[in-house]
Amino acid sequence: MKNPRKVGLWSLTVLLILGIIGGGFAWQRQQHQQKQPRIVATTFAVVQIANKLNLPLVGVPTTANTLPQRYQHVAKVGSPMNPSVEKITALKPTAVYSVTTLSDQFGKAFKAQHVTPHFLNLTSVAHLEQTLTQLGKQYHRQSAAAKQVKHIQAAKKLAKKRAQQRPAPRVLVLMGLPGANYMVATNRSYVGDLVRLAGGTNVFTSRKQEYMQPNDEAIQKTNPQVILRLEHAMPKMVTKQFDQEFKDNQMWSKTAAVRHHRVYDLQEPIFDATANMRVTTALDQVSHWLYPTKGVKV
């Protein structure tokens, strides 16, 4: 017959071991949860990047764009132009991402809540590549980031090949503003960068400015051969504004672009004011507009 004391000791030992093992698993699970990033993306461009890098998000912007399946039930934090600091802080994020072009939108309310967003520079294709590489390294997604950069570089090579030994067309880029007419996009803007990569010559250049006020006399003097009209916000309204402007202002009818029917409308989801993961399709489209196969004067 077994000694009751020994049986009790064995039982106690087993319970202690199981407790230690269970506690160890619980500790590991807690540590894993603490290491998991809690990322809030406040623009659709950042959501696209996160999706390509297979990153988890706890907050996404309120947008008319179709979110990737994995983020469709994630908490909405408001529009990119006016995100809710209350909703963001409630999510206890480890990182909040926006873009440099919207840095002015994050003011005193965010500072008061000690929320410091990271502003990603997506003003050019090169900056998008750098952002992918940096985020890939930070979140251990180097392979996924390298894959996306490779796709972008392939698209750049294809556009360059298409433009070889062909005269560069003069291109005017306009950005429509709902209810406020339009601005001229320079070579420093994202679409301006697409024009450069596609082999075109932007008729308005700047060292620092992405956008500038339009001037009829200056536009007429440059006589653009191609006009690209960006309508990324409220496209239906902006397209009507552009159509009315081009109808009422006789200056446009004198440009080579209008005479030869080379005015193109750029809309989401392919085109936006900032670089995004539709860049390869966008660059290919601009390349074909600038260098059509045949039948169009350049």
Predicted regions and their residues:
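Basic- and aromatic-lined ligand-binding clefts that recognize polyanionic substrates
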Residues: 37-53, 144-198
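Flexible loop/hinge segments that line or gate small-molecule binding clefts
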Residues: 67-69, 102, 106-138
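Alpha-helical, coiled-coil/dimerization segments enriched in small aliphatic residues
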Residues: 63-66, 70, 183-211
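Proline-aspartate-enriched helix->loop->beta-strand connector
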Residues: 85-98, 115, 216-229
